Amino acid sequence: MKQYKLMQVALLAILLFGWAGCSQNEEEVPGNVRNGIVLNVTDTGIISNEPSTRTEDTGFVTTFTQGDQIGLFAVKDGAILDEINNMPFTFNGSSWSGKPILYDDRLVGVNFYAYYPYQSEMTGKTDLIGDDFFAPLAAGWELTTEQSDQKAYAKQDLMTSNATALIGENGNYSLSFQLTHRMSLVVVKLPSTRYIFTDAEGVAMPEETPYVAMSVDVAFYLDNVEEGTKISPYYDAKKDEYRLLRKPSSENQIIGHYNDKQCTLDTAEKMKEGKYKRFVVDGGYKEVTHHLQVGDYYYADGSVVSGNEAEPAKDNCIGIVCWVGNPMPSVLYKDVAGTPYTATNDALLRSHPNCVHGLVMSLYTETGKFSPALTQSIHDWFMTTSFTSSYVSVTGYYDANENNKNKPLRFLGYNNSEVLDLYYDTFKTDFECFQYQDDCESSFPSPSITTGWYVPSSGELVALQDKDNSLESKLNTKLIKVSDKTMDISATYWSSTERNNKNMYIVTYSKTAGSAGTGGVKTNTYTYRFFLGF
């Protein structure tokens, strides 16, 4: 496997050539054999095929990793030496190892050739007459359309050296190979947006990890959009770009799909050996400063559109921002006297430390049951487990750590969803709420930079309404523009906060407040709205 970096890398490793008179046993020899020949392996990199105003383009350069293998040939007087005929050497992370080769007069005047990745069968794949020893190998090299796996991608990136002579000085010998890439590379940068969220005064909200909305539903095809023409490039998450190895002089059109859009990338006359062509689609990466507010529209790629937008796009809208701020319990309630909420038991902080901006309410809504009646409450089971050090209980009532008048108002939906999952993993009890949650995720897929959808706690639902009737004035007025299902103020809503083995907390609304009640029998039918943190 290889890793690719935009920097020049030279790997210094020991190639185990022994001296005459050393052991000739066919054993694997470590790379630090005394007086061994030093092997310098340098990748010249894949550089841009565009004229550059920079003094240097280091391109995409290969770093070998443990387990990688190169093949070695030695040629003298127009013939390959039998003992160095496609000899494999394996990189162990710091040096190369293989069968020892004894140095003597036979190696005088020998030219060495190396290639990557090693192939066990090389018959007919070298040329002893022309200038390019590996010309047949490169000409017959086959690329697959499946390159999404890093290992599979690396094994298709053919690199070869030119003739390399053994250098001797004061009894020390070395070989220095420069490997050049024989394929060409397509690099695709799809649109992504870094959001800098601010408050009303324009002050940026604190965050440790940049919030970047990336393209979703990405797919690539060769020439035509058909199932048989689909290709899978390698995705570099750190650079947020796709890479596809292509044969030099290939002239396919690459068709990309993303965010319900399509782009066509014409590679004709752009695929050059050892060079890459970068395509930047719709401007690629950009930064946007956004005043985040309740009522903003939230989309499947993580993008956010102002709630003041007159005609927001309906496609890929998955919810409405319903609360702004850091929703982590250890942050929200850190100043509460005797607070039980700490960084240690904050599941949201632990699993999604970047979700510090707010909460989104789903467009999805449905009515149904919550779960079967249980012989033992989830809270009672939870208190007997080791999970008590990593989570807080789902109870809104039986909690010795906090005034039970306040507990139903806490933001604990993500914590509760995790505890419900742990309960299911233990007892395999089918909760209807999971089915609706999965349906929500299927209908309105959440971005990977979020928590994913969960049943909100009673406190999160209560917070939707206030004396200004924000549920209707700030949420429903936005919902109606992207959905035919507004928040029914007369409905009763499920929460993930538990009352006892038979009941969950349910939330109802008036024009001025939300109220959490304990009468939510788990087998009754009430309404669902799901939340996610971002």
UniProtKB/Swiss-Prot annotation:
Residues 1-21 form the signal peptide. Keywords: Cell outer membrane, Fimbrium, Lipoprotein, Membrane, Palmitate, Signal. GO terms for cellular component: cell outer membrane; pilus. It comes from the Bacteria. It is found in: Fimbrium; Cell outer membrane. Transmembrane segments: none annotated. May be part of the fimbrial tip. This is Putative fimbrium tip subunit Fim1C. It comes from Bacteroides ovatus (strain ATCC 8483 / DSM 1896 / JCM 5824 / BCRC 10623 / CCUG 4943 / NCTC 11153).
